[in-house]
């Protein structure tokens, strides 16, 4: 069984027991979180597609950890001016383990 849900402006296809990285959620590690914006649920033979969301659909997950992603380097370079700016960015994420899918 798998589901497609929406979190942090992105869509994620998940199955039970899978670990996925989402945009940062303000929930402590070890706590449970529910996602209600379910776009699609499939159990192999039945497929429920929401318009836009599946009514009564729910994905439950347990927060594993919070962290920061890999560094993305931003370089601004002006030719012939001896001018260069370098910056970096590391996006915060929350890693969750999917514990249940219901439709």
Swiss-Prot record:
GO MF annotations in UniProt: rRNA binding; structural constituent of ribosome
GO-annotated biological processes: translation
Alphabetically ordered keywords of this record: Ribonucleoprotein, Ribosomal protein, RNA-binding, rRNA-binding
A UniProt-annotated Pfam family: Ribosomal_L21p
InterPro entries noted in UniProt: bL21-like, bL21-like_sf, Ribosomal_bL21, Ribosomal_bL21_CS
GO-annotated cellular components: cytoplasm; ribonucleoprotein complex; ribosome
PROSITE patterns assigned to the protein according to its UniProt record, in alphabetical order: RIBOSOMAL_L21
Residues in coiled coil: none
Subunit structure: Part of the 50S ribosomal subunit. Contacts protein L20.
Family the entry assigns: Belongs to the bacterial ribosomal protein bL21 family.
HAMAP family linked to this entry: Ribosomal_bL21
Function: This protein binds to 23S rRNA in the presence of protein L20.
PANTHER family: 50S RIBOSOMAL PROTEIN L21 (PTHR21349), LARGE RIBOSOMAL SUBUNIT PROTEIN BL21M (PTHR21349:SF0)
Protein name per UniProt: Large ribosomal subunit protein bL21
Upper classification of the organism: Bacteria, Pseudomonadati, Pseudomonadota, Gammaproteobacteria, Alteromonadales
């Amino acid at each position: 069984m798998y589901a497609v849900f929406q979190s942090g402006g992105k869509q994620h296809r998940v199955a039970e027991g899978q670990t996925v990285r989402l945009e940062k959620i303000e929930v402590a590690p070890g706590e449970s979180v529910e996602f209600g914006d379910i776009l699609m649920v499939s159990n192999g033979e039945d497929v429920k597609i929401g318009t836009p969301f599946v009514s009564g659909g729910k994905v439950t997950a347990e927060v594993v950890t919070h962290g920061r992603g890999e560094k993305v380097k931003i370089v601004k370079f002006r030719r012939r001016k001896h001018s260069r700016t370098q910056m970096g960015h590391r996006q915060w994420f929350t890693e969750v383990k999917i514990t249940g899918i219901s439709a």
